[in-house]
Regions:
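Soluble extramembrane domains of integral membrane proteins
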Residues: 17-110
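Charged, low-complexity intrinsically disordered regions
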Residues: 40, 80-192
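Active-site acidic/histidine clusters and adjacent loop/turn architecture
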Residues: 2-26
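Proline-rich intrinsically disordered, low-complexity coils
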Residues: 12-15, 33, 49, 122, ...
Length: 192
């Protein structure tokens, strides 16, 4: 009995009216020159010409009388690092984005080595500075790494009062910056 109640309470709750896959369908149109393959209703995979595979999944977030469905772009790989490291990035500059600052949330010593390596490649920082992202995280744990970017565009805002639905499309410039950043980071992590 207790187990059933616990599972029900911990079950993911999606906002009322959320339809899995609608935002991904619109994003797929923005990624038209690239091959997209559906993995499930809430996730798909982008396959770049060089063979890099990027996973995209929907991330719904409830608000008062509305909800936002944003898309998270994920990249996975193998590394020689075994320690748990979490690195996040912020863009400095209020009116104009100037530079990216990396900071370590977990695994300070090894994390600082990864941050130093990221800072040795200014092109990655310049690309990320121009990219409009909400959240950017690099997780490393037990020889695996995962890079996740939540973009401001490629998201949908659904309001119940007044009833409306608005998709913020991923422009071709932002698509280029996003895919370039993911490709460069994949190449960099291959060196670790």
């Amino acid at each position: 009995m207790f187990n059933r109640v616990w599972r029900r309470l911990n079950k993911p709750r999606y906002p009322a009216g959320y339809q899995a896959g609608v935002t991904l369908s619109r994003l797929e149109q923005n990624l038209s020159p690239y091959c997209c393959e559906r993995l499930s209703a809430k996730s798909m995979q982008i396959i770049l010409p060089d063979g890099l595979q990027i996973e995209v999944c929907e991330k719904p977030k409830a608000l008062f009388l509305a909800y936002i469905v944003s898309c998270c772009f994920r990249l996975h790989g193998i590394t020689s690092l075994k320690e748990k490291i979490v690195i996040k990035a912020k863009v400095k500059g209020i009116f104009r984005r100037k530079s990216v600052t990396y900071y370590c949330c977990r695994g300070a010593e090894s994390g600082q080595q990864v941050i130093d390596l990221l800072n040795q490649y200014p092109l990655i920082g310049e690309t990320l500075a121009e990219l409009d992202f909400r959240d950017l995280t690099l997780n490393i744990h037990q020889g695996q790494w995962q890079f996740e970017v939540e973009h401001f565009a490629a998201s949908e805002i659904v309001s119940r009062l007044p009833a409306s639905r608005r998709y913020l499309r991923l422009t071709s410039e932002q698509r280029y910056l996003l895919l370039s950043a993911l490709l460069m980071l994949s190449q960099l992590m291959g060196k670790l």
